[in-house]
Amino acid sequence: MKLLVFAHVPPPFHGQSFMVQQLLDELRSSDDQSIEVFHVNSRLSKEVDDIASASLRKLGLLLGYCLKAVWLRLRHGVNHFYYVPAPGLRNAVYRDWIVMLLCRPFFLRIIYHYQAAGVGDWLETGAYAWERWVSQLLLGRPALSIVLGDYYHEDAAKLAPRKIVTVPNCASDPCPDYADKLQVAQQARAKALGQALSGGGPLATFHVLYLSLCYRDKGLFDAVDAVAELNGRLQARHLSARVQLDVAGRFYLAGEETEFNERLGQADLNDDHGPLIVYHGFADEAKKRELLAQADAFVLASYYEFEAHPVSLIEAMAHGLPIVVTRWRILPELFPAGYEGLVDTKSPGQIADRLDGFLGRIDEAGLRDQFLRHFTRRAFGEKIRAALLALENE
């Protein structure tokens, strides 16, 4: 099989570009040479906050990328076209129209790999009748649609693919020596916090990590309010324990960044030992590893409209962290049945309750084992390769 991957890799860094890089690395590094990969790095945006905008510069770049794709088709006989479709955003869907109008006639099979949700729902509820017609004409009937979880089969089905398969996102194991090093440190911190909670030890800080786009709909402000509420509970019980929220990521909206900074100065987010919320900005790979290694729990209380399968959740699982996550779209599907860390959306009180329950404990739900079974790059590679090669037998 000859596969053209028409999708961009970092920069800018976000879940979609990260997973495209994982796909390329996995298919190219494998001893299995049954898939020959060609890549058009179709980067249009310089920064994350530029992703949803439209401009003549982007149109020119897109036309150039399409010409390169057609040239690779004619020069190397590449006959399978891999593409990451837009979420339900009008400008992004129009981009997809242009790509398919120019490229689709040259390729035998079209493969969609959804890294964001909502295009099917948008076609039904947000698109004009003529937009639905054009979308079905240009985007409909792909040979294969790859989705991140069973929850998204219905959304992908709106474009009438011949086949839909589920392939979760992945990450390389960041701590293969987890049992010998990181787990030991986590157990020691949990023991110290347990002693502080029982009144028999010095002050201990429980670190909760938020690692995502800094955006209200991702649950950032709910996490902030939850940490304020939980610290108030601990202070009322006169316990020598505190909870600190470490926030890492770029802000999507300047107004929300201003609101966040103003919130940090309020009395309920500061105690005699310092701030209870620490903002670290965008975390590069080294900083991210540092924050995950020192964290005692992870929170992502998202109700983001286009939420898919956050890579940060996979990395938190790989680090064996207890996780608080919302019952939103695909997110519960990623966790073991009956997982105790699930909360409703927009519920800071529930987040505080779950974090309170995690104090002095390490992960008891086997989330690292969940990562090793389902979300490693090896598991991803096996599933994605099987899905792609199955097209050859049709």
Please provide the spans of the model-predicted regions.
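Conserved donor-binding/catalytic core segment of Leloir-type glycosyltransferases
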Residues: 4-5, 183-218, 224-229, 246-249
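Donor nucleotide-sugar binding/catalytic pocket of nucleotide-sugar-dependent glycosyltransferases
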Residues: 133-196
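Acidic donor-binding loop of glycosyltransferase active sites
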Residues: 293-308, 321
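Short alpha-helical donor nucleotide-sugar binding micro-motif in glycosyltransferases
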Residues: 282-283, 290-295
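Short hydrophobic beta-strand element within catalytic cores of glycosyltransferases
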Residues: 318, 322-325
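Conserved acidic donor-binding segment of nucleotide-sugar-dependent glycosyltransferases
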Residues: 337-348, 356-362
